[in-house]
Every structure is written in structure tokens, then in C-alpha cells.
């Protein structure tokens, strides 16, 4: 990055080097991208960007479609989703918020635990909690799939996981309150902030 005309900041005793100016697109780049062909690196970066967009918008759009615009879904998917959401005790917004909170708790617990316990805790915790919650009628199977895809997609860019979690919850609240209009409005505000930030 220094060869691209940027400045570097090194602090004595810290293993981290900062380069200035910082651009958001840097988070989608990996050091492995420089050791493969340009086509492979481009495909990897596009895949990371797509995964981040999915991590942000999947829960919010699922809730917005379920609450306000269920007819947007294709007929086959509509039948599957409507069969999975019958007799649920939670509203779609609360259901998704509950599942995202459980996902964050599982991630935090697996980070704090020793390595040999963390894997078992995360796998068994996710399987047991997910299966029990579906059988108890608290959550639906499509919601668990959406949250799992969103959680996995967020870790394609590990440096952004904290930010993605906060923005994902904000988009979920906007979708639960005014539907797709809320998602579009909040997305426009986020893009405005990113463009005007120094």
C-alpha cells in the first residue's frame, strides 16, 4: 500500500500498522489476492461484497416481505414460507431479532471459551437451540436459514463483523416498522454518511 502513495503509521510495541487514507474497499481486499491471478482476485472480491450485502439485507428484507409484501416472493417459496410460519407465537420482527441475538450470544461465547470447547459449544448450541425453538413454535425454519446465511456471510470480511451486526439490527428495525421503505430510506442514509465521511 505504501507503493500506492499512502502514508503508514507504526506505533512502538503494537503489531498493527495503519495506512492512510483509509478506504472502505480495503476491507474487501485480502493479502491472498496478490498471489493469485487478477481474475480470481476480482471474483473473490465480488463474492465478499455480495456476502456483505446479503449479511446486511437478508434479515431485513425477509421481515419486510413477511409483514408488508408477501406477494413479492415466488409462489413456490411463498408456499414454503407460509407453511413454516403458521402458528408462531412471535411476530416476524421479534422472531428475527431473537434469532440474531442468539447468534451474537453464540459467537461471543465461542470466542471467550477455550478452542476445544468453543467448536462443540457453537455447533451443539446452534443445533439444539434451533431444533428446539422450531419444535416449540417460537421461530420458523426459514428464519433460522436466513439468520444462518446472514451470520456466515458476515464473516467473509472479519474486520467488519461488529459494524455489520449494528447496521443489520438497524435495518431490521426499519423493516419491522415501515417495511421496504424503511430499508431503502436507511440504506440511503448510510450511503450518504459513507460518501460524506472524512
Language-model region placement:
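Cytosolic regulatory modules rich in charged/polar residues
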Residues: 1-95
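Hydrophobic alpha-helical transmembrane segments in multi-pass membrane proteins
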Residues: 53, 70, 92-96, 100, ...
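Residue-level signal for the membrane-embedded core of alpha-helical transmembrane segments
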Residues: 54, 93, 97, 121-124, ...
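Alpha-helical transmembrane segments of multipass membrane proteins
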Residues: 60, 101, 105-108, 127-132, ...
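Short, non-helical or kinked segments that cap or interrupt transmembrane helices
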Residues: 89, 111-123, 136-142, 159-162
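Hydrophobic alpha-helical segments embedded in the membrane of multi-pass proteins
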Residues: 97, 101, 119-128, 147-149, ...
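Hydrophobic alpha-helical transmembrane segments of membrane transport and translocation systems
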Residues: 141-198
Amino acid at each position: 500500500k505504501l507503493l500506492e502513495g499512502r502514508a503508514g503509521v507504526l506505533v512502538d510495541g503494537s503489531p498493527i500498522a495503519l495506512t492512510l487514507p483509509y478506504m472502505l474497499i480495503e476491507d474487501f481486499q485480502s493479502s491472498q489476492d496478490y498471489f493469485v491471478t487478477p481474475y480470481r482476485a476480482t471474483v473473490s472480491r465480488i463474492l465478499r461484497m455480495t456476502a456483505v450485502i446479503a449479511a446486511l439485507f437478508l434479515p431485513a428484507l425477509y421481515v419486510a416481505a413477511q409483514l408488508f409484501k408477501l406477494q413479492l416472493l415466488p409462489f413456490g417459496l411463498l408456499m414454503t414460507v407460509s407453511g413454516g410460519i403458521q402458528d408462531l407465537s412471535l411476530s416476524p420482527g421479534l422472531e428475527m431479532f431473537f434469532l440474531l441475538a442468539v447468534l451474537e450470544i453464540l459467537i461471543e461465547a465461542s470466542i471467550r471459551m477455550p478452542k476445544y470447547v468453543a467448536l462443540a459449544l457453537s455447533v451443539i448450541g446452534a443445533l439444539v437451540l434451533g431444533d428446539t425453538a422450531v419444535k416449540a413454535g417460537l421461530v420458523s425454519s426459514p428464519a433460522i436459514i436466513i439468520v444462518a446465511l446472514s451470520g456466515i456471510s458476515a464473516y467473509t470480511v472479519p474486520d467488519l463483523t461488529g459494524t455489520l451486526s449494528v447496521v443489520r439490527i438497524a435495518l431490521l428495525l426499519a423493516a419491522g416498522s415501515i417495511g421496504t421503505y424503511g430499508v431503502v430510506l436507511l440504506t440511503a442514509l448510510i450511503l450518504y454518511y459513507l460518501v460524506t465521511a472524512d
